[in-house]
């Protein structure tokens, strides 16, 4: 930042010095007018033309430098996006696996001693799997009895209810997921409506 300010100050002072030189040359041309011989007149015109070309080149360099800096900044932002959302498609394909493991856990019967070890293994696998995807920025949307938010919820059905406020999420049909702040699947819910 300091380098840019110093560079801008140097560029501005150089431009001001060149403008002063240019004005002095123009004044000297106007005061002497026809008294100067043709060679000196031509030299002065060439110096003026040279000063104009130098100013034009300096402006071009400044403009191109700014454009290069903008390109670098955009590339940095694009790389950050790629790192952040590069896993989006992969994680989206894993969501049905998470759903199936959760469904298995919800219908499992812990009273059967033969299956309890298998159920415990599935539970540990699901926990480990969820911990791993959470490390990469995946968050689930699963709250009920919250206001319906069309940005993260998809209403599957509307149920009339006097016990709940209107537009409240009553039940969760399928969890939704957000990856690094970006919705990758909305939560499918039922919503309350007043009678």
From Swiss-Prot:
Question: Which Gene3D superfamilies does UniProt cross-reference here?
Answer: 3.90.20.20, Head domain of nucleotide exchange factor GrpE (2.30.22.10)
Database matches in PROSITE patterns? GRPE
What subcellular locations does the record give?
Answer: Cytoplasm
Q: Please, one GO biological process term?
A: protein folding
Q: Indicate yes or no for the key word Chaperone.
A: yes
Q: Does the keyword Ion transport apply?
A: no
Question: What InterPro entries does this protein map onto?
Answer: GrpE, GrpE_coiled_coil, GrpE_head
**A matching Pfam family:** GrpE
Any one GO CC term of the record: cytosol
Q: Which GO terms describe its molecular function?
A: adenyl-nucleotide exchange factor activity; protein homodimerization activity; protein-folding chaperone binding; unfolded protein binding
Q: Which UniProt keywords apply?
A: Chaperone, Cytoplasm, Stress response
Subunit notes for this chain?
A: Homodimer.
Family stated for the protein in its record: Belongs to the GrpE family.
Q: Which NCBIfam families match?
A: PRK14140.1 (NF010738), PRK14150.1 (NF010748)
Q: What is this protein called?
A: Protein GrpE
Instruction: Identify the species of origin.
Output: Blochmanniella pennsylvanica (strain BPEN)
What is the primary gene name for this protein? grpE
